[in-house]
Amino acid sequence: MGQARTTGLRGMAEAVTRPDQILDIAAGQFRTKGYAAVSMRDIATEAGMRTPSLYYHFPSKDDLVMAVMDRGIVVVREAVMAALDDLPPDAATVTRLDTAMRAHLRALHGASDYTSANVRIFGQLPEAWRRANMPERRAYQAIWSALLAPTCAADPAVLPMRVAFVIGALNATLEWVDPARIDIEALADQVTQVLRHGVLGEGAA
């Protein structure tokens, strides 16, 4: 959000022609204030543009919200996939899980507001919008299903619950971590240890 506010005619022209900047600002506002408390005027003001100019890029708040929501999943999915791609093909299950959990946490608590905005406001959205975001969510859940399947070999029926639990536990760190004092690597150490040894047990070895 460091490039959020611009001033003068040149800055306003840049804001009007940069949808990505608008999305950055919207994601930051949704993350900090929630869905209902954010208006198109709020976003336009922070972007240094007039509200009608904002509607040129995003015809409604619905369009803006859904763009932020979809990007929130894409950001974390790409982060996890990139981290996994860096591992050797024969990496152990526990190594792949540890890598994926760390990548998820870095995306969630890192510089981008998109993933944390998605997590925070998903439950605040109308049901139709939640359904619209589900294809992206299912694509991401499929990655975790593949990662966690070896830990459920003895009872495959528990796999969906285990996927939901792990993703939910990672996302829940938004609720109890102080963003002003966060050390992402220390957090990753703590959370991955708990999930690997307390939840996944010997099946993750």
Regions found by a protein language model. Give the residues of each.
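Amphipathic alpha-helical packing segments from all-alpha helical-bundle domains
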Residues: 74-81, 127-152, 160-164, 189
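Short helix-capping/turn signature of helix-turn-helix
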Residues: 55-58, 119-125, 168
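Short hydrophobic clusters on alpha-helical segments that form packing/core surfaces
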Residues: 22-30, 72, 104, 195
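Hydrophobic alpha-helical connector segments
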Residues: 67, 81-110
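Helix-turn-helix
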Residues: 18-21, 25, 29-63, 67
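Hydrophobic alpha-helical segments that form the core
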Residues: 102-105, 156-177, 185-198
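N-terminal intrinsically disordered/low-complexity leader segments
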Residues: 1-17, 28, 87, 203-205
